[in-house]
Curated annotation (Swiss-Prot):
Binds directly to 23S ribosomal RNA and is necessary for the in vitro assembly process of the 50S ribosomal subunit. It is not involved in the protein synthesizing functions of that subunit. This is Large ribosomal subunit protein bL20. It comes from the Bacteria. It comes from Synechococcus sp. (strain WH7803). Keywords: Ribonucleoprotein, Ribosomal protein, RNA-binding, rRNA-binding. The keyword Ribonucleoprotein applies. Belongs to the bacterial ribosomal protein bL20 family. The gene is rplT.
Amino acid sequence: MARVKRGNVARKRRNKILRLARGFRGSNGTLFRTANQRVMKALCNAYRDRRRRKRDFRRLWIARINAAARLNGVSYSRLIGGLKQADVRINRKMLAQLAVADPSSFTTVVNATQG
C-alpha cells in the first residue's frame, strides 16, 4: 500500500481554521495552534449565546412591559394574568413594542385587562 502524505488536506484544514480566526487579536489570528483554540472557544460561545439570546430578549421584554405597566398602576404579573383571563392573545415581544413605541395603545390594552 502506498504512503499517503497529507499535504493538500492538512493545508486546507489549517487555512480553514485561519480563515475563521481572521480578525482575532495578535497571534490568535495568525498562528495555527492558538487560532485553533480561539476558534473552538468562539464556536462554543456562539452556540451557547444563540440559546442565551432568546432568554435575554424575553427578560428585556418583560422588564419593559413591567415598567410601562407600573406607569399604568398595575404590576407585570397582574397584567399578564388579566390578559390571559380577557383572552387577549398578544405576545410579550409585541407588548414591549407597544409599551415603547405607542404608550397610549399600551394603556388601552392595560384597561382591557381590568374590565
